[in-house]
A protein has these predicted regions:
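Arg/Lys-rich amphipathic alpha helix in sigma70-family domain 2
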Residues: 66-70, 80-100, 120, 172
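Short, Lys/Arg-enriched C-terminal cap helix and immediately downstream tail that follows
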Residues: 69, 91-94, 139, 174-190
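Internal acidic/polar
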Residues: 2-10, 95-123, 151
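Helix-turn-helix DNA-binding module
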Residues: 128-165, 179
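Structural recognition of an alpha-helix C-terminal capping motif at a helix-to-coil junction
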Residues: 52-59, 72-84
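Short, charged helix-capping/linker segments at alpha-helix termini
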Residues: 2-4, 18-27, 37-56, 163, ...
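Sigma70-family region 2
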Residues: 18-19, 45, 58-73, 92-93
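Short helix-capping/turn signature of helix-turn-helix
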Residues: 31-34, 42-45, 143-153
Length: 190
């Protein structure tokens, strides 16, 4: 089904829902649930939080569908709701997305512009791919520090290793990560 057909079918389902057919909204949820959930997981990287965000997205859509003007596709509208919920979650929980730069992490862009969000997601995908190539002891330390936001001491406690070892693993792991990312980017700037 192409986008025009999907849009036409979405419009019909919306009209049926607005006329009182609850099953029409259920059909919309079935159609978009996996895509919205996948988007939420990519942004927040926490399965339970992504599930909550997905459910909240559809709850908000259910309540606001009478005001949906149709200026954009239904999926674009759901996408925007999802991104806003994800950004709110990230702000609320002070979670940060890892970068390969010298700073520990940088927050997701505050703008909900889809192009900016997609660029951030692509950068995160590239970083995660590079992280996956690291030896396990470096990978675990970097994930716990940069993706989970744990302190060096908390990581040392979890891994039952000295604090200095945690710092060394993260430092050396980041060097390897930068080298891997440069290779991925054909020696482009980081």
């Amino acid at each position: 089904m192409d986008d025009d057909e999907r849009g036409a079918e979405d419009h019909i389902l919306i009209q049926r829902f607005l006329a009182g057919e609850e099953v029409a909204f259920e059909r919309l949820v079935e159609r978009y649930y996996q895509r919205i959930d996948r988007l939420a997981q990519q942004v927040v990287r926490h399965p339970m939080a992504a599930e909550d965000i997905t459910q909240e997205c559809f709850l908000r859509a259910y309540r606001a569908l009478p005001q949906f003007r149709g200026d954009a596709s239904l999926y674009s509208w759901l996408y925007r709701i999802t991104i806003n919920l994800c950004l709110n979650y990230l702000r609320r929980h002070a979670l940060q997305v890892s970068t390969a730069q010298d700073s520990d992490a940088s927050a997701l862009p505050a703008a909900a512009d889809p192009a900016v969000v997609l660029e951030a997601q692509e950068r995160e995908r590239l970083i995660r791919s590079a992280i996956d190539t690291l030896p396990a002891h470096y990978r675990v330390a970097i994930i716990l520090r940069d993706l989970e936001g744990l302190s060096y001491q908390a990581i040392a406690d979890i891994l039952s290793i000295p604090l200095g070892t945690v710092k060394s693993r993260i430092n050396f792991g980041k060097r390897l990560l930068r080298k891997t990312l440069r290779a991925f980017l054909d020696d482009g700037p980081l």
